[in-house]
Protein backbone atom coordinates (compact mmCIF):
# COMPACT_ATOMS: atom_id res chain seq x y z
CA UNK A 1 0.00 0.00 0.00
CA UNK A 2 2.88 2.39 0.76
CA UNK A 3 4.29 1.76 -2.70
CA UNK A 4 0.90 2.47 -4.19
CA UNK A 5 0.72 5.80 -2.36
CA UNK A 6 4.18 6.80 -3.59
CA UNK A 7 3.22 6.05 -7.16
CA UNK A 8 0.17 8.27 -6.81
CA UNK A 9 2.10 11.22 -5.39
CA UNK A 10 1.89 13.26 -8.58
CA UNK A 11 1.15 16.89 -9.12
CA UNK A 12 -2.52 17.14 -8.22
CA UNK A 13 -3.16 19.85 -10.76
CA UNK A 14 -2.20 17.37 -13.46
CA UNK A 15 -3.55 14.22 -11.88
CA UNK A 16 -7.00 15.68 -11.34
CA UNK A 17 -7.85 15.70 -15.03
CA UNK A 18 -5.66 12.88 -16.38
CA UNK A 19 -6.26 9.44 -14.91
CA UNK A 20 -6.22 7.60 -18.24
CA UNK A 21 -2.46 6.73 -18.06
CA UNK A 22 -3.06 4.95 -14.75
CA UNK A 23 -5.04 2.29 -16.60
CA UNK A 24 -1.72 1.05 -18.02
CA UNK A 25 0.04 0.81 -14.65
CA UNK A 26 0.61 -2.79 -13.58
CA UNK A 27 0.59 -2.04 -9.85
CA UNK A 28 -3.04 -0.93 -10.20
CA UNK A 29 -4.04 -4.46 -11.15
CA UNK A 30 -1.81 -5.97 -8.48
CA UNK A 31 -3.53 -3.76 -5.91
CA UNK A 32 -6.98 -4.69 -7.19
CA UNK A 33 -6.15 -8.38 -6.84
CA UNK A 34 -4.32 -8.16 -3.54
CA UNK A 35 -7.23 -9.91 -1.81
CA UNK A 36 -8.16 -13.04 -3.71
CA UNK A 37 -6.44 -13.92 -6.96
CA UNK A 38 -2.67 -14.02 -7.34
CA UNK A 39 -1.69 -10.40 -7.13
CA UNK A 40 1.54 -10.82 -9.12
CA UNK A 41 0.17 -12.62 -12.17
CA UNK A 42 1.19 -9.80 -14.47
CA UNK A 43 4.56 -9.26 -12.86
CA UNK A 44 5.51 -12.93 -12.74
CA UNK A 45 4.64 -13.80 -16.32
CA UNK A 46 5.49 -10.74 -18.36
CA UNK A 47 9.21 -10.59 -17.72
CA UNK A 48 9.11 -6.83 -17.14
CA UNK A 49 10.71 -5.30 -14.09
CA UNK A 50 9.24 -1.85 -14.58
CA UNK A 51 5.88 -0.87 -13.14
CA UNK A 52 4.35 0.29 -16.40
CA UNK A 53 3.65 -2.00 -19.32
CA UNK A 54 1.61 -0.16 -21.92
CA UNK A 55 2.03 -2.90 -24.52
CA UNK A 56 0.66 -5.86 -22.57
CA UNK A 57 -2.42 -4.03 -21.27
CA UNK A 58 -3.13 -2.60 -24.71
CA UNK A 59 -2.81 -6.05 -26.28
CA UNK A 60 -5.11 -7.45 -23.62
CA UNK A 61 -7.81 -4.84 -24.28
CA UNK A 62 -7.54 -5.40 -28.04
CA UNK A 63 -7.87 -9.14 -27.50
CA UNK A 64 -11.01 -8.64 -25.42
CA UNK A 65 -12.53 -6.40 -28.08
CA UNK A 66 -11.74 -8.96 -30.79
CA UNK A 67 -13.38 -11.71 -28.79
CA UNK A 68 -16.43 -9.52 -28.29
CA UNK A 69 -16.95 -8.98 -32.01
CA UNK A 70 -16.62 -12.72 -32.52
CA UNK A 71 -19.68 -13.04 -30.25
CA UNK A 72 -17.77 -15.18 -27.80
CA UNK A 73 -19.02 -13.74 -24.53
CA UNK A 74 -16.45 -15.27 -22.26
CA UNK A 75 -16.58 -12.52 -19.70
CA UNK A 76 -19.23 -14.06 -17.50
CA UNK A 77 -19.49 -17.62 -18.78
CA UNK A 78 -20.16 -20.29 -16.22
CA UNK A 79 -17.33 -22.63 -17.25
CA UNK A 80 -13.70 -21.61 -17.34
CA UNK A 81 -12.67 -23.92 -20.16
CA UNK A 82 -9.43 -23.86 -22.07
CA UNK A 83 -11.01 -22.36 -25.19
CA UNK A 84 -10.61 -18.82 -23.87
CA UNK A 85 -6.90 -18.58 -23.27
CA UNK A 86 -4.69 -15.56 -23.70
CA UNK A 87 -0.96 -15.49 -22.91
CA UNK A 88 -1.38 -18.88 -21.27
CA UNK A 89 -4.10 -17.79 -18.81
CA UNK A 90 -7.87 -17.87 -18.83
CA UNK A 91 -9.44 -14.82 -20.44
CA UNK A 92 -12.07 -14.59 -17.70
CA UNK A 93 -9.27 -13.92 -15.25
CA UNK A 94 -7.80 -11.11 -17.32
CA UNK A 95 -11.16 -9.48 -17.98
CA UNK A 96 -11.82 -9.50 -14.25
CA UNK A 97 -8.44 -7.88 -13.62
CA UNK A 98 -9.16 -5.14 -16.15
CA UNK A 99 -12.51 -4.20 -14.65
CA UNK A 100 -11.34 -4.34 -11.05
CA UNK A 101 -8.29 -2.30 -11.95
CA UNK A 102 -10.48 0.19 -13.78
CA UNK A 103 -12.62 0.52 -10.65
CA UNK A 104 -9.49 1.45 -8.66
CA UNK A 105 -8.52 4.05 -11.25
CA UNK A 106 -11.95 5.70 -11.31
CA UNK A 107 -11.99 5.88 -7.50
CA UNK A 108 -8.74 7.90 -7.41
CA UNK A 109 -10.29 11.35 -8.16
CA UNK A 110 -12.83 10.85 -5.39
CA UNK A 111 -10.10 9.76 -2.98
CA UNK A 112 -8.00 12.85 -3.81
CA UNK A 113 -11.06 15.06 -3.38
CA UNK A 114 -11.59 13.54 0.07
CA UNK A 115 -7.95 14.13 1.04
CA UNK A 116 -8.11 17.77 -0.05
CA UNK A 117 -11.31 18.20 1.94
CA UNK A 118 -9.78 16.76 5.12
CA UNK A 119 -6.55 18.78 4.87
CA UNK A 120 -6.25 21.25 7.69
CA UNK A 121 -9.26 19.83 9.54
CA UNK A 122 -8.99 17.94 12.78
CA UNK A 123 -11.60 15.21 12.89
CA UNK A 124 -12.08 12.64 15.58
CA UNK A 125 -12.01 9.13 14.14
CA UNK A 126 -15.13 7.41 15.44
CA UNK A 127 -14.95 3.94 13.95
CA UNK A 128 -17.78 2.84 16.22
CA UNK A 129 -20.16 5.12 14.33
CA UNK A 130 -19.75 2.80 11.34
CA UNK A 131 -21.86 0.25 13.17
CA UNK A 132 -25.38 -0.23 11.85
CA UNK A 133 -26.65 -0.21 15.43
CA UNK A 134 -25.40 3.36 15.90
CA UNK A 135 -28.35 4.58 13.83
CA UNK A 136 -31.01 3.27 16.21
CA UNK A 137 -30.15 5.57 19.16
CA UNK A 138 -30.47 8.42 16.65
CA UNK A 139 -33.90 7.17 15.55
CA UNK A 140 -34.94 6.73 19.16
CA UNK A 141 -33.94 10.29 19.98
CA UNK A 142 -35.45 11.98 16.90
CA UNK A 143 -38.35 9.95 15.55
CA UNK A 144 -40.43 10.03 18.72
CA UNK A 145 -41.01 13.76 18.09
CA UNK A 146 -41.92 13.42 14.41
CA UNK A 147 -45.27 12.81 12.73
CA UNK A 148 -44.93 11.60 9.13
CA UNK A 149 -42.41 9.44 7.33
CA UNK A 150 -41.64 8.75 3.67
CA UNK A 151 -40.62 5.18 2.84
CA UNK A 152 -38.44 5.50 -0.26
CA UNK A 153 -37.12 2.78 -2.56
CA UNK A 154 -34.32 4.29 -4.64
CA UNK A 155 -34.85 3.56 -8.31
CA UNK A 156 -32.24 1.70 -10.32
CA UNK A 157 -30.67 3.28 -13.44
CA UNK A 158 -32.50 1.92 -16.48
CA UNK A 159 -29.58 2.87 -18.73
CA UNK A 160 -25.90 3.00 -17.83
CA UNK A 161 -25.38 6.07 -20.02
CA UNK A 162 -27.13 8.02 -17.27
CA UNK A 163 -24.39 6.95 -14.87
CA UNK A 164 -21.72 8.08 -17.36
CA UNK A 165 -23.36 11.49 -17.78
CA UNK A 166 -23.41 12.10 -14.04
CA UNK A 167 -19.93 10.67 -13.58
CA UNK A 168 -18.39 13.15 -16.02
CA UNK A 169 -19.08 16.05 -13.64
CA UNK A 170 -16.60 14.50 -11.20
CA UNK A 171 -14.11 12.75 -13.50
CA UNK A 172 -12.75 15.29 -15.97
CA UNK A 173 -10.66 12.85 -18.00
CA UNK A 174 -12.58 12.31 -21.25
CA UNK A 175 -10.39 9.41 -22.37
CA UNK A 176 -11.23 7.33 -19.31
CA UNK A 177 -14.93 8.03 -19.68
CA UNK A 178 -14.82 7.04 -23.36
CA UNK A 179 -13.18 3.74 -22.43
CA UNK A 180 -15.77 3.17 -19.71
CA UNK A 181 -18.60 3.99 -22.10
CA UNK A 182 -17.16 1.56 -24.64
CA UNK A 183 -17.15 -1.36 -22.23
CA UNK A 184 -20.61 -0.56 -20.91
CA UNK A 185 -22.25 -0.24 -24.31
CA UNK A 186 -20.44 -2.62 -26.62
CA UNK A 187 -21.03 -5.75 -24.59
CA UNK A 188 -24.64 -6.91 -25.03
CA UNK A 189 -24.49 -8.77 -21.73
CA UNK A 190 -23.95 -5.49 -19.83
CA UNK A 191 -27.69 -4.81 -19.98
CA UNK A 192 -28.37 -7.75 -17.70
CA UNK A 193 -25.55 -7.16 -15.23
CA UNK A 194 -27.45 -4.59 -13.18
CA UNK A 195 -31.00 -5.77 -12.70
CA UNK A 196 -33.61 -4.61 -10.21
CA UNK A 197 -33.96 -6.97 -7.29
CA UNK A 198 -36.28 -5.62 -4.62
CA UNK A 199 -34.57 -2.50 -3.29
CA UNK A 200 -31.02 -3.35 -4.27
CA UNK A 201 -28.96 -4.51 -7.21
CA UNK A 202 -27.92 -7.93 -8.43
CA UNK A 203 -24.20 -7.59 -9.12
CA UNK A 204 -21.93 -9.79 -11.13
CA UNK A 205 -19.86 -11.86 -8.72
CA UNK A 206 -16.74 -11.39 -10.83
CA UNK A 207 -16.98 -7.61 -11.06
CA UNK A 208 -18.74 -6.72 -7.84
CA UNK A 209 -16.41 -3.88 -6.87
CA UNK A 210 -16.77 -2.15 -10.24
CA UNK A 211 -20.56 -2.18 -10.23
CA UNK A 212 -20.72 -1.43 -6.52
CA UNK A 213 -18.80 1.76 -7.24
CA UNK A 214 -21.24 2.71 -10.01
CA UNK A 215 -24.22 1.98 -7.79
CA UNK A 216 -22.85 3.97 -4.85
CA UNK A 217 -22.15 6.90 -7.14
CA UNK A 218 -25.70 6.68 -8.50
CA UNK A 219 -27.13 6.73 -4.97
CA UNK A 220 -24.86 9.63 -4.05
CA UNK A 221 -26.34 11.65 -6.89
CA UNK A 222 -29.82 10.75 -5.69
CA UNK A 223 -29.00 12.10 -2.25
CA UNK A 224 -27.41 15.31 -3.53
CA UNK A 225 -30.80 17.03 -3.58
CA UNK A 226 -31.14 16.66 0.20
CA UNK A 227 -27.75 18.28 0.79
CA UNK A 228 -28.68 21.09 -1.57
CA UNK A 229 -32.00 21.87 0.11
CA UNK A 230 -30.43 21.69 3.55
CA UNK A 231 -27.78 24.21 2.55
CA UNK A 232 -30.35 26.49 0.96
CA UNK A 233 -32.62 26.41 4.00
CA UNK A 234 -29.59 27.32 6.13
CA UNK A 235 -29.08 30.68 4.40
CA UNK A 236 -26.99 29.54 1.46
CA UNK A 237 -24.03 27.90 3.13
CA UNK A 238 -20.88 27.25 1.13
CA UNK A 239 -21.75 25.11 -1.85
CA UNK A 240 -20.16 24.34 -5.18
CA UNK A 241 -21.15 26.90 -7.82
CA UNK A 242 -21.39 24.16 -10.44
CA UNK A 243 -23.88 22.24 -8.34
CA UNK A 244 -25.81 25.43 -7.56
CA UNK A 245 -26.15 26.41 -11.21
CA UNK A 246 -27.06 22.87 -12.11
CA UNK A 247 -29.92 22.84 -9.61
CA UNK A 248 -31.07 26.29 -10.82
CA UNK A 249 -31.35 24.84 -14.32
CA UNK A 250 -33.40 22.00 -12.92
CA UNK A 251 -35.85 24.42 -11.30
CA UNK A 252 -36.28 26.22 -14.60
CA UNK A 253 -37.17 22.95 -16.28
CA UNK A 254 -40.10 22.17 -14.00
CA UNK A 255 -41.12 25.53 -12.57
CA UNK A 256 -44.23 25.67 -14.75
CA UNK A 257 -45.36 22.28 -13.53
CA UNK A 258 -44.57 22.38 -9.85
CA UNK A 259 -43.43 25.66 -8.41
CA UNK A 260 -43.85 29.37 -8.74
CA UNK A 261 -41.22 31.42 -10.52
CA UNK A 262 -39.86 32.88 -7.33
CA UNK A 263 -36.78 30.85 -6.42
CA UNK A 264 -36.87 31.97 -2.79
CA UNK A 265 -40.42 30.73 -2.47
CA UNK A 266 -39.28 27.34 -3.71
CA UNK A 267 -36.75 27.05 -0.93
CA UNK A 268 -39.20 28.36 1.65
CA UNK A 269 -41.68 25.60 0.86
CA UNK A 270 -39.17 22.97 1.97
CA UNK A 271 -37.59 24.85 4.85
CA UNK A 272 -38.23 22.28 7.56
CA UNK A 273 -36.00 22.26 10.67
CA UNK A 274 -37.32 18.87 11.81
CA UNK A 275 -36.45 16.89 8.71
CA UNK A 276 -34.36 13.73 9.11
CA UNK A 277 -33.06 11.42 6.41
CA UNK A 278 -31.70 7.88 6.87
CA UNK A 279 -30.64 5.39 4.20
CA UNK A 280 -29.25 1.88 4.04
CA UNK A 281 -28.54 0.41 0.59
CA UNK A 282 -31.55 1.00 -1.66
CA UNK A 283 -34.06 1.93 1.05
CA UNK A 284 -34.35 5.36 2.62
CA UNK A 285 -36.53 7.05 5.24
CA UNK A 286 -37.43 10.74 5.28
CA UNK A 287 -39.23 11.81 8.47
CA UNK A 288 -40.69 15.21 9.28
CA UNK A 289 -42.76 17.02 11.89
CA UNK A 290 -44.72 18.74 9.17
CA UNK A 291 -48.21 18.13 7.87
CA UNK A 292 -49.49 15.66 5.32
CA UNK A 293 -49.54 18.45 2.73
CA UNK A 294 -45.82 19.09 3.20
CA UNK A 295 -45.00 15.39 2.82
CA UNK A 296 -47.01 15.20 -0.39
CA UNK A 297 -45.05 18.18 -1.70
CA UNK A 298 -41.83 16.38 -0.84
CA UNK A 299 -42.98 13.28 -2.67
CA UNK A 300 -44.00 15.25 -5.75
CA UNK A 301 -40.74 17.18 -5.66
CA UNK A 302 -38.55 14.08 -5.43
CA UNK A 303 -40.37 12.30 -8.25
CA UNK A 304 -39.98 15.30 -10.56
CA UNK A 305 -36.35 15.81 -9.62
CA UNK A 306 -35.42 12.21 -10.38
CA UNK A 307 -37.30 12.31 -13.67
CA UNK A 308 -35.75 15.57 -14.87
CA UNK A 309 -32.23 15.03 -13.59
CA UNK A 310 -31.83 11.33 -14.42
CA UNK A 311 -34.09 11.38 -17.50
CA UNK A 312 -36.01 8.40 -16.23
CA UNK A 313 -39.49 7.60 -15.03
CA UNK A 314 -39.61 7.41 -11.25
CA UNK A 315 -42.63 5.49 -10.09
CA UNK A 316 -44.57 7.41 -7.41
CA UNK A 317 -45.50 4.10 -5.81
CA UNK A 318 -41.86 3.71 -4.72
CA UNK A 319 -42.50 6.51 -2.19
CA UNK A 320 -45.07 5.85 0.53
CA UNK A 321 -46.36 8.42 3.02
CA UNK A 322 -47.14 6.97 6.43
CA UNK A 323 -48.00 8.32 9.84
CA UNK A 324 -45.61 7.17 12.54
CA UNK A 325 -48.33 6.67 15.12
CA UNK A 326 -50.02 3.86 13.17
CA UNK A 327 -47.25 2.51 10.96
CA UNK A 328 -44.30 0.17 11.55
CA UNK A 329 -41.03 0.90 9.78
CA UNK A 330 -39.36 -2.14 8.26
CA UNK A 331 -35.77 -0.95 8.28
CA UNK A 332 -32.46 -2.75 8.84
CA UNK A 333 -34.21 -5.96 9.82
CA UNK A 334 -36.16 -4.34 12.67
CA UNK A 335 -39.80 -3.31 12.96
CA UNK A 336 -39.71 0.19 14.44
CA UNK A 337 -42.82 1.87 15.81
CA UNK A 338 -43.69 5.04 17.71
CA UNK A 339 -46.41 4.24 20.23
CA UNK A 340 -48.15 6.22 22.94
CA UNK A 341 -47.13 5.17 26.43
CA UNK A 342 -49.78 6.02 29.07
CA UNK A 343 -48.46 7.83 32.09
CA UNK A 344 -50.38 8.50 35.30
CA UNK A 345 -49.24 11.18 37.76
CA UNK A 346 -50.75 11.50 41.24
CA UNK A 347 -50.92 15.07 42.56
CA UNK A 348 -51.55 15.71 46.25
CA UNK A 349 -52.85 19.12 47.36
CA UNK A 350 -53.53 19.32 51.12
CA UNK A 351 -56.59 17.13 51.58
CA UNK A 352 -57.38 16.53 47.90
CA UNK A 353 -55.52 14.29 45.49
CA UNK A 354 -55.72 14.25 41.73
CA UNK A 355 -54.71 11.67 39.15
CA UNK A 356 -53.46 13.20 35.91
CA UNK A 357 -53.38 10.97 32.87
CA UNK A 358 -50.83 11.78 30.21
CA UNK A 359 -49.34 9.98 27.24
CA UNK A 360 -45.78 10.15 25.96
CA UNK A 361 -44.37 8.86 22.69
CA UNK A 362 -41.90 5.99 22.81
CA UNK A 363 -39.78 4.56 20.00
CA UNK A 364 -39.81 0.75 20.02
CA UNK A 365 -37.76 -1.72 18.00
CA UNK A 366 -38.96 -5.29 17.57
CA UNK A 367 -37.56 -8.36 15.88
CA UNK A 368 -39.94 -9.56 13.12
CA UNK A 369 -40.46 -13.27 13.69
CA UNK A 370 -42.21 -14.11 10.41
CA UNK A 371 -39.33 -13.07 8.10
CA UNK A 372 -36.87 -14.86 10.38
CA UNK A 373 -38.89 -18.09 10.23
CA UNK A 374 -38.97 -17.70 6.47
CA UNK A 375 -35.18 -17.29 6.34
CA UNK A 376 -34.60 -20.29 8.60
CA UNK A 377 -36.97 -22.34 6.46
CA UNK A 378 -35.10 -21.33 3.31
CA UNK A 379 -31.83 -22.42 4.95
CA UNK A 380 -33.45 -25.80 5.86
CA UNK A 381 -33.32 -25.35 9.63
CA UNK A 382 -37.11 -25.65 9.96
CA UNK A 383 -40.24 -25.88 7.84
CA UNK A 384 -42.48 -22.97 6.89
CA UNK A 385 -44.41 -23.38 10.16
CA UNK A 386 -41.27 -23.09 12.28
CA UNK A 387 -40.92 -26.76 13.22
CA UNK A 388 -37.20 -27.64 13.58
CA UNK A 389 -35.61 -30.06 11.11
CA UNK A 390 -32.23 -31.75 10.87
CA UNK A 391 -29.49 -30.43 8.61
CA UNK A 392 -28.41 -33.49 6.54
CA UNK A 393 -25.64 -31.66 4.64
CA UNK A 394 -23.80 -31.09 7.94
CA UNK A 395 -24.08 -34.69 9.14
CA UNK A 396 -20.63 -35.52 7.74
CA UNK A 397 -18.95 -32.96 10.02
CA UNK A 398 -17.61 -33.68 13.47
CA UNK A 399 -19.86 -33.19 16.48
CA UNK A 400 -17.92 -30.15 17.67
CA UNK A 401 -18.12 -28.51 14.22
CA UNK A 402 -21.87 -29.08 14.02
CA UNK A 403 -22.48 -27.62 17.47
CA UNK A 404 -20.13 -24.71 16.77
CA UNK A 405 -21.92 -23.83 13.51
CA UNK A 406 -25.36 -23.81 15.06
CA UNK A 407 -24.08 -21.88 18.05
CA UNK A 408 -22.37 -19.30 15.86
CA UNK A 409 -25.55 -18.70 13.85
CA UNK A 410 -27.57 -18.12 17.00
CA UNK A 411 -24.93 -15.86 18.56
CA UNK A 412 -24.83 -13.76 15.40
CA UNK A 413 -28.62 -13.41 15.38
CA UNK A 414 -28.71 -12.70 19.10
CA UNK A 415 -25.92 -10.18 18.64
CA UNK A 416 -27.75 -8.31 15.89
CA UNK A 417 -31.23 -8.39 17.43
CA UNK A 418 -30.08 -7.43 20.92
CA UNK A 419 -31.86 -4.12 20.41
CA UNK A 420 -35.27 -5.77 20.25
CA UNK A 421 -37.56 -4.59 23.03
CA UNK A 422 -39.10 -8.03 23.52
CA UNK A 423 -36.97 -11.14 23.46
CA UNK A 424 -39.65 -13.80 22.95
CA UNK A 425 -39.00 -13.93 19.19
CA UNK A 426 -35.30 -14.43 19.86
CA UNK A 427 -36.05 -17.23 22.31
CA UNK A 428 -38.10 -18.98 19.64
CA UNK A 429 -35.19 -18.75 17.19
CA UNK A 430 -32.94 -20.25 19.87
CA UNK A 431 -35.38 -23.13 20.37
CA UNK A 432 -35.47 -23.85 16.61
CA UNK A 433 -31.69 -23.87 16.23
CA UNK A 434 -31.05 -25.95 19.37
CA UNK A 435 -33.55 -28.63 18.37
CA UNK A 436 -32.30 -28.58 14.77
CA UNK A 437 -28.76 -29.09 16.08
CA UNK A 438 -29.88 -31.99 18.28
CA UNK A 439 -31.72 -33.64 15.39
CA UNK A 440 -28.70 -33.24 13.12
CA UNK A 441 -26.45 -34.92 15.70
CA UNK A 442 -29.00 -37.69 16.29
CA UNK A 443 -29.26 -38.26 12.54
CA UNK A 444 -25.49 -38.54 12.29
CA UNK A 445 -25.27 -41.13 15.10
CA UNK A 446 -28.44 -42.95 13.95
CA UNK A 447 -30.19 -42.35 17.23
CA UNK A 448 -33.21 -40.54 18.60
CA UNK A 449 -33.03 -36.99 19.88
CA UNK A 450 -33.98 -37.99 23.43
CA UNK A 451 -31.41 -40.78 23.62
CA UNK A 452 -28.66 -38.61 22.18
CA UNK A 453 -29.33 -35.68 24.53
CA UNK A 454 -29.42 -38.06 27.47
CA UNK A 455 -25.98 -39.35 26.55
CA UNK A 456 -24.50 -35.98 25.59
CA UNK A 457 -26.16 -33.78 28.15
CA UNK A 458 -28.24 -30.68 27.50
CA UNK A 459 -25.70 -28.50 29.26
CA UNK A 460 -23.21 -28.76 26.40
CA UNK A 461 -25.66 -27.31 23.88
CA UNK A 462 -26.67 -24.62 26.35
CA UNK A 463 -23.03 -23.60 26.77
CA UNK A 464 -22.51 -23.15 23.04
CA UNK A 465 -25.75 -21.24 22.57
CA UNK A 466 -25.20 -18.80 25.42
CA UNK A 467 -21.54 -17.96 24.82
CA UNK A 468 -21.20 -14.29 23.98
CA UNK A 469 -18.22 -12.30 22.75
CA UNK A 470 -16.98 -9.33 24.72
CA UNK A 471 -17.65 -6.20 22.66
CA UNK A 472 -18.50 -2.58 23.31
CA UNK A 473 -22.16 -1.70 23.33
CA UNK A 474 -24.63 1.05 24.17
CA UNK A 475 -27.60 0.57 26.46
CA UNK A 476 -30.05 3.18 27.66
CA UNK A 477 -31.86 1.10 30.27
CA UNK A 478 -31.24 1.70 33.96
CA UNK A 479 -29.38 -1.02 35.82
CA UNK A 480 -31.84 -3.05 37.83
CA UNK A 481 -32.20 -6.53 39.21
CA UNK A 482 -35.83 -6.67 38.14
CA UNK A 483 -36.17 -9.50 35.62
CA UNK A 484 -38.98 -7.66 33.84
CA UNK A 485 -36.78 -4.64 33.14
CA UNK A 486 -33.90 -6.90 32.10
CA UNK A 487 -36.23 -8.64 29.68
CA UNK A 488 -37.03 -5.32 27.97
CA UNK A 489 -33.50 -3.91 27.95
CA UNK A 490 -32.14 -2.91 24.57
CA UNK A 491 -28.44 -3.19 23.76
CA UNK A 492 -26.85 -1.57 20.71
CA UNK A 493 -23.47 -3.01 19.72
CA UNK A 494 -20.73 -0.99 18.04
CA UNK A 495 -19.13 -3.71 15.91
CA UNK A 496 -21.89 -4.51 13.39
CA UNK A 497 -21.17 -3.32 9.86
CA UNK A 498 -23.70 -5.40 7.89
CA UNK A 499 -27.08 -7.05 8.33
CA UNK A 500 -26.78 -10.68 9.34
CA UNK A 501 -27.73 -12.89 6.40
CA UNK A 502 -28.45 -16.57 6.89
CA UNK A 503 -27.33 -17.15 3.31
CA UNK A 504 -23.76 -16.52 4.49
CA UNK A 505 -23.74 -18.93 7.41
CA UNK A 506 -21.28 -21.18 5.60
Curated annotation (Swiss-Prot):
Keywords on record: Chloroplast, mRNA processing, Plastid, RNA-binding, tRNA processing
Question: Has the keyword Phosphoprotein been applied to this entry?
Answer: no
Q: What's the superkingdom here?
A: Eukaryota
Q: Which GO molecular function annotation, any one, does this entry have? A: RNA binding
Give the main localization category.
Answer: plastid
GO terms, biological process: mRNA processing; RNA splicing; tRNA processing
**Protein's cellular compartments:** Plastid, Chloroplast
Task: State the Pfam families in the record.
Answer: Intron_maturas2, MatK_N
Which InterPro entries would you find in this protein's record? Domain_X, Maturase_MatK, Maturase_MatK_N
Q: Which GO terms describe its cellular component?
A: chloroplast
Which HAMAP family does the record match to this protein?
MatK (MF_01390)
User: Which protein family is it in?
Assistant: Belongs to the intron maturase 2 family. MatK subfamily.
Q: Which PANTHER family does the annotation name?
A: MATURASE K
Q: Any idea what job this protein has?
A: Usually encoded in the trnK tRNA gene intron. Probably assists in splicing its own and other chloroplast group II introns.
What protein does this entry describe? Maturase K
Taxonomic source organism: Rhododendron ferrugineum
Amino acid sequence: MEEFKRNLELDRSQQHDFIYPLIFQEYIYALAHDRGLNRSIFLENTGYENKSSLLIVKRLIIHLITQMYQQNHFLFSGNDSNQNKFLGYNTNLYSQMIFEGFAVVVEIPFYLRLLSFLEGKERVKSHNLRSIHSIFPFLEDKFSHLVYVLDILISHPIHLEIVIQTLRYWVKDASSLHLLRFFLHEYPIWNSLITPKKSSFSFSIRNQRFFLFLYNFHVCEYESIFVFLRNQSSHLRSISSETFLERISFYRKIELEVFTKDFKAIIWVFKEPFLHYVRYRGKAILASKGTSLLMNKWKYYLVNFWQCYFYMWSQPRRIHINQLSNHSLDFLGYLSTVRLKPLMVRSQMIENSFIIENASKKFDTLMPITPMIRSLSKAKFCNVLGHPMSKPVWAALSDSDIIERFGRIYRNLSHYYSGSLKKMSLYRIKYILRLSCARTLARKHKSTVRAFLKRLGVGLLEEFFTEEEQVFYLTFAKASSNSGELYQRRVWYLDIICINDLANYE
